[in-house]
């Protein structure tokens, strides 16, 4: 009892001191607006203090770190890698986090609610591990499927990427963590990534490579944007006023801060004038060189203030001054369950002849084979790598699901030995994949090593072969027609073994769709010349224009291995009754989806719009999707709304979106190549 009054006095002393501090430092008064607080803070800073806040300054524990200013009550500012969990590779000591499935798996869900939950987990763990910013999501369009960072993105379609990216951002930021959407813009290859000059025409840039960034700002309300490595039409993105000022701030209303990618800044004056707010990783351009530029009158101190205000305003708006993030234990059991759920939802059933899947729980023997069957595939390589809190490898995952079955593991290094094992098993499950990584592109979409030979040998030995593909993007499958079932699992994350088992045995009915086209051959890609990719003499020509992904396949009349939007279920669905009508400057399409099978399941209804031929657009473009969950025999009317922007193209004469007049075609179905419903629409 004796200590009680003393504790009370101490607490009262702290609470009474707070207004005094706020009076001397009004920016610490949470009753004021973020804009006012930021302005008051910057006005109180010395020039040296201002410059110290323009760039990262690694310390003994953190690489991506802006140090505090105790005199002014400015907290330290820590930045974490994303986008599939808190990637702490730069921290010392490194901190484990939940390794979620790759965002390519997230994109496969075609589900904005799932994307928001995914982001919410990333944001919560980023804050719990005492960081202010999550560098993600990565929403660059998959122009080149061989890109080493395909796994970090969300596919090839700007409409899909924009919808899911905005939802992911909203989820990240629910926890007071700032989402830093990246890489702005057209960061589409790793080869020569820090110097490549991408020649992109104005229409293509605005129709394919910018709309999803616009959504990240206008719908996701991203607090930060990372400017990318490449040049676009001769100008590095981090010193490109057309991108950082004209588009981002003036046209889209962005109020947050722009941070450079690691070493992506190339100037002091140019970057400052363009609107790059924060240099990563050190002060090469925004340190002493910035101070000298100010003293020489090349950059005004007012401009320095203007560069600082957006980050401080964002920190105030996110409560990071009033409640800085502190280390907090992670709810690992709950987040493990979420990681498993995300992985299951993102797996795409590519092929399932004779309804081989789901497997029966009564199976007696399973041959588990392949280089990706030995341990969990938690993610790709590079800055996005997450140190998992735990892992479920494929073997224990299968054994836990079917404890009565004999499951035997073979790493697949000897196809003949693996085939012999498969021949003696009731079912063979072959796990193959790739190892995409930041910093280099894949030389081919073919599986490395002997994996193709392995699948062929096992399939020949056992007619009940299931192939599970763990890849970051498309891979070639010369054996596809010889195996009855193919499950695209992407990089499933730390719950790999449990999630794959859940889908194989029907605990989950797959409903995911491909967010990227799987070609049949390396040459079957839009950027298929050296001039287009990786470029010649440091220049990559985007001469394919608008024909990227499924748009190119449609325009060329070429059949892919598996089309964009494709994905099977353990049940079947039918579409009927399409009705399209104009509503103001937009339109609505209404149709019926019916579950014609014997299991409950979900279908993703996709709407594609074909423009009048004179518009010069690809044959069809995704403009809407809707996920529908149905019991056997159940049907539901679905409505998808189209906005005026959906009927517009970028006019290079007016430098603006312009509505197209004429006859449009609305198509509805379950993939870009399976569209049973069609209706004309005159505008």
Predicted regions and their residues:
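Positively charged n-region of N-terminal signal peptides that target proteins for export
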Residues: 1-5
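Glycoside hydrolase catalytic-domain context in secreted enzymes
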Residues: 22-650, 656-658, 663-673
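Short beta-strand elements
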Residues: 674-683
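Bacterial N-terminal signal peptides
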Residues: 7-19
């Amino acid at each position: 009892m004796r200590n009680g009054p003393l504790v009370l006095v101490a607490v009262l002393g702290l609470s009474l001191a707070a207004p005094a501090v706020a009076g001397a430092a009004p920016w610490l008064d949470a009753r004021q607006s973020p804009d006012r607080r930021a302005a008051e803070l910057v006005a109180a800073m010395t020039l040296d203090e201002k410059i110290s806040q323009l760039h990262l300054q690694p310390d003994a524990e953190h690489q991506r770190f802006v140090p505090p200013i105790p005199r002014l009550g400015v907290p330290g500012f820590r930045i974490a890698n994303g986008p599939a969990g808190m990637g702490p590779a730069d921290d010392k000591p490194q901190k484990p986090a939940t390794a979620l499935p790759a965002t390519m798996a997230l994109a496969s869900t075609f589900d904005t609610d799932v994307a928001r939950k995914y982001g919410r987990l990333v944001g919560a763990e980023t804050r719990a591990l005492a960081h202010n910013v999550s560098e993600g999501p990565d929403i660059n369009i998959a122009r080149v499927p061989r890109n080493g960072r395909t796994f970090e993105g969300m596919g090839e379609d700007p409409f899909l990427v924009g919808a899911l990216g905005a939802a992911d951002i909203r989820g990240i930021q629910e926890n007071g963590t700032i989402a830093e959407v990246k890489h702005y813009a057209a960061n589409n290859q790793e080869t020569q990534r820090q110097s490549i000059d991408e020649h992109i025409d104005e229409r293509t840039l605005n129709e394919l490579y910018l709309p999803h960034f616009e959504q990240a700002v206008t719908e996701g309300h991203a607090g930060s944007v990372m400017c990318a490595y490449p040049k676009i039409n001769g100008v590095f993105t981090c010193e490109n006023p057309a991108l950082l000022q004209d588009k981002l701030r003036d046209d889209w209303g962005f109020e947050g801060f722009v941070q450079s990618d690691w070493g992506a800044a190339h100037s002091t004056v140019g970057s400052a004038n363009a609107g790059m707010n924060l240099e990563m990783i050190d002060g090469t351009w925004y340190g002493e060189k910035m101070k000298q530029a100010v003293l020489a009158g090349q950059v005004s101190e007012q401009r320095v203030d203007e560069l600082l205000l957006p980050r401080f305003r964002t920190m105030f708006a996110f409560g990071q001054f009033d409640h800085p993030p502190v280390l907090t234990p992670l709810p690992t059991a709950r987040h493990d369950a979420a990681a498993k759920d995300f992985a299951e939802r993102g797996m795409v059933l590519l092929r399932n002849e004779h309804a081989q899947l789901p497997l029966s729980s009564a199976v007696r023997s399973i041959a588990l084979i392949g280089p990706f069957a030995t341990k969990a595939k938690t993610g790709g390589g590079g800055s996005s790598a997450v140190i998992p809190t735990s892992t479920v490898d494929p073997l224990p995952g299968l054994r836990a699901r079917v404890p009565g079955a004999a499951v035997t593991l073979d790493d697949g290094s000897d196809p003949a030995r693996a085939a012999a094992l498969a021949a003696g098993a009731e079912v063979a499950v072959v796990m193959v994949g790739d190892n995409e990584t930041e910093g280099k592109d894949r030389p081919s979409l073919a599986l490395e090593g002997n994996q193709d030979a392995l699948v062929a040998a096992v399939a020949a030995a056992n007619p009940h072969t299931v192939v599970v593909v763990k890849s970051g993007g498309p891979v070639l499958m010369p054996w596809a027609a010889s195996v009855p079932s193919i499950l695209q699992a992407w990089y499933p994350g730390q719950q790999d073994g449990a999630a794959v088992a859940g889908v194989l045995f029907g605990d989950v009915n797959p409903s995911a769709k491909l967010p990227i086209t799987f070609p049949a051959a390396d040459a079957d890609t839009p950027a298929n010349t050296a001039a287009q990719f990786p470029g010649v003499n440091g220049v990559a020509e985007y001469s394919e224009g608008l024909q990227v992904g499924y748009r190119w396949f449609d325009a060329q009349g070429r059949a892919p291995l598996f089309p964009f939007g494709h994905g099977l279920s353990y049940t079947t669905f039918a579409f009927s009754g399409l009705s399209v009508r104009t509503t103001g400057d937009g339109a609505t399409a209404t149709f019926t989806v019916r579950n014609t099978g014997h299991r409950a399941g979900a279908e993703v209804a996709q709407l594609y719009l074909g423009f009048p031929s004179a518009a010069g657009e690809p044959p069809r473009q995704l403009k809407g999707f809707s996920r529908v969950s149905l019991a056997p025999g159940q049907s539901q009317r679905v409505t998808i709304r189209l906005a005026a922007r959906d009927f517009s193209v970028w006019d290079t004469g007016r430098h603006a979106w312009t509505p197209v007049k004429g006859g449009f075609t609305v198509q509805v179905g379950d993939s870009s190549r399976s569209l049973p419903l069609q209706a004309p629409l005159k505008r």
